[in-house]
Amino acid sequence: MSSSSVSGIREAFLDFFEKQGHTRYPSAPLIAEGDASLLFTNAGMVPFKQRFITGVSDVKTATTSQKCLRAGGKHNDLENVGYTNRHHTFFEMLGNFSFGDYFKETAIELAWRFVTKELGLSKERLWITVYSEDQEAFDIWKKITGYTDHKIIRISTSDNFWSMGDTGPCGPCSEIFYDYGDGVPGGLPGTDESDGARYTEIWNLVFMQYNRDESGELHKLPRGCIDTGMGLERIAAVMQGVCDNYETDMFQAIIDRSRSIFGSHDHPIAHRVIADHVRAASFLIAEGLTPGNEGRNYVLRRIIRRAVRYIYQIVGDKFSLHEVVPVLTREGSAGYMGNAYPEIVKAEQSIVSTLKIEEDGFADTLRRGTGILEQEIRGLKSGEVLSGEIAFKLYDTYGFPLDITLDVAKERGLKFDEDGFNRCMAKQKEQSRKHWKGSGEAQTASSHILNKHKATSFVGYENHRVKSMVKEIFCSGEAVTSMGEGEEGIAVLDITPFYAESGGQEGDTGLLKVVTTKCGSVAEVVDTTKSNNVHLHKIRVIRGTLKVGDVVEAVVDKQRREKLRANHSATHILQSVLRTLIGEGIQQKGSLVAADKLRFDFSHALPLTKEQLRTVEMEVNRQIMANQPVIIDHCSLEDAVQEGAIALFGEKYNDQNVRVVSMGSSKELCGGTHVRFTGDIGAFRIISETGIAQGVRRIEAITGHEVVSSMNRDSESLQQVAECLSVPVDQVIEKLKKVFVEQREINKKMATICYTHMNSCAKCIEVGSEIKLYVGEFSNIPVEVVASYVKEKMHTNEVLAISTTDGKRTTFIVGVGESAIKRIKATDIVKALQQIQGKGGGNASIARASLPSEYSAKAAEIIRQTVIDAIQNSGA
């Protein structure tokens, strides 16, 4: 076989069976078409299921490399990914199929020929299993392999008897195992130690010869069918001499990319998870799936979020899973999958944007949930039990995925109280069911509040601190009279200065200080939301006890509030400026007003140009520096709209009384908190402008001190550049231009020298034809220079194969002239180099290949022989 790379093995398998008369089919989609019993295609035979069931087929034999996914439903490997050598969510299944054509003997003979002849595996390393009652298969294997009885193992369990379901086609199966040798733990198939890695199943051959009826009785089929499956990742590991799928060339390329982005820290499991999950997510998104909360969409969301959680484990808040994608979609890497699945290349932009949106949306949930979980397990030792109630609270209250809780528990060696979690889940479902029926029993906290309390008196526009009374406390959804230190829950006050999350603005945080007792009890307000205008203060008691009836001093985190004010007011000005400068048709599609940044989503078909962004930024800052007053008015909705106030589409307003916020050119209906003068914003800086959906753009920006910090960082970087160039800061651009001009001149001179050297040293090799083959091996000449030389020197009847090496890898640039192309293509030569680990691509006239430098001499001979063979085969 020419190459042991993943792509090389895939092609070798398909080519082998194609030559045996099989029809090569492209992979079916991962989203199983027309099969309600499956979430995803999870085996190679799935696309042919109806052919097996009905016995009707327009072809008799077929071969495929099928994309498969096992993450959800009956076949779910998600939780094991990263912890074992062989579990994957996404994988490729090589298979050959017979629909009433050949049967056992031919299937076994073809399989044996492929693994021993095509792959070149030693028969001493191979073992066979058969179903204990399948004497026919045993005899065929013995005849074809020449094995003694002990090398063909009889298995009596269901592992060696396959069925499509409770009824329908079924039959015994036979497996080929590879023995990695004494250095790897594990026992023979069928033994207690068979779970070890030493003996690895590489191919499963299913002989469908029966039909099982509803009573369970087996009936012989008139014509047997064959369904085989060979995991590409497993056989690649065998061929590459490793017993870990994640050490194969494809996975190593993805893992290397992951390490380059997130750092080569000691987190091997995390990088494995990232490598596996980015493949799965990318292929699902390429098929049009988007993250969601149900069915297949939820499985995609789980996969992405699990990967993000492992990224968080490595580097904290750098959520950049999307940056790994190019290793799959761009040529030049062993991780490239576009040659077999071009759809992933076409969908690159969609994949990247979808991943980024999901990462951003999950970031806050992950940070908060991880912090709470760490607090809960801090005192637990390995072997102890993580409470199911805690896991459920994280899941239910904070939206923290159970998968991630289980992963953390597994890493810490903790057991998990699954029964406790299920009890909480069942209780919640019962509560929801009763509430839906209107029974009034076991009401949830929010429904209890709606029935008992009037709207909270909000005084936060004018005050940061007020005295208030605790009217109600809820813990785990139940009304309680008090909460002790360390407990979390919800407090309802009669008066509050805390702004509740609304209109994109995050809720206030701060403290509740008990003043009715001398114990100094304090609760931290970690978030504020509202239900039917009743403010719900999410609290954690940090000292003493908080009781219903306590008088508290409610204190808003003033510094955070001021940042929120600035960002909210800046968002208003930004929208007004966009409508003025870019287009009146712009509509708000979403927003986030956080303490550290603002985000504004708006309708617009095209990306904003650099000049447009610069103009927008300057105009926003002009209005800030004008220090205009922010005016708050109340009027009817009709009057506000007539005065030109912007109302958010789909938002519900009080027709008789709306709050109108005006500043500079902006006039909007808004209930949020704002600065008193635009100058209080300080400054405004756009940090990004991106597309998040078709026709929707997103601007992210910072204000105030964040702008100063950002500019200081930029200034420091510029100063460092100036020091490196030994010029004042104001001369950096001119100096760089001069350096670039000088570098281009140096490059030209270097290219001239290199051209002269290559001209004098390149040799013409005899290939027995009027076609001339020129080869040359050089050291440390830039690849771009070699490529330019080949393009310039390539004549109509010539083949050039010029290489350059850095001592570790050698890159060949192959050029084929216009007449010579009729007999050999540049890509034919590059493909021939795959047998010595050559990787690359190109077109018929010019291509490149990179390979380990120790194979350089052998490469020259392969090139020569490839050209000679091509000339002879063309009849020259």
Swiss-Prot record:
Cofactor names from the entry are: Zn(2+)
Which residues are noted in the entry as Zn(2+)-binding?
H568, H572, C670, H674
* MF term (GO), any: alanine-tRNA ligase activity
Q: Where in the cell is it found?
A: Cytoplasm
Query: What does the record say about how the cofactor binds?
Result: Binds 1 zinc ion per subunit.
- One short Pfam name that applies is tRNA_SAD
**UniProt keyword annotations, A-Z:** Aminoacyl-tRNA synthetase, ATP-binding, Cytoplasm, Ligase, Metal-binding, Nucleotide-binding, Protein biosynthesis, RNA-binding, tRNA-binding, Zinc
Q: Which reactions are catalysed by this chain?
A: tRNA(Ala) + L-alanine + ATP = L-alanyl-tRNA(Ala) + AMP + diphosphate
Q: Which GO terms describe its biological process?
A: alanyl-tRNA aminoacylation; negative regulation of DNA-templated transcription
Please give the positions of the paired cysteines in each disulfide bond: none
Keyword Nucleotide-binding assigned to the entry: answer is yes
The UniProt record lists the keyword Lyase: no
Comment on protein domains: Consists of three domains; the N-terminal catalytic domain, the editing domain and the C-terminal C-Ala domain. The editing domain removes incorrectly charged amino acids, while the C-Ala domain, along with tRNA(Ala), serves as a bridge to cooperatively bring together the editing and aminoacylation centers thus stimulating deacylation of misacylated tRNAs.
Q: What does this protein do?
A: Catalyzes the attachment of alanine to tRNA(Ala) in a two-step reaction: alanine is first activated by ATP to form Ala-AMP and then transferred to the acceptor end of tRNA(Ala). Also edits incorrectly charged Ser-tRNA(Ala) and Gly-tRNA(Ala) via its editing domain.
Q: What is the protein name stated in its UniProt record? A: Alanine--tRNA ligase
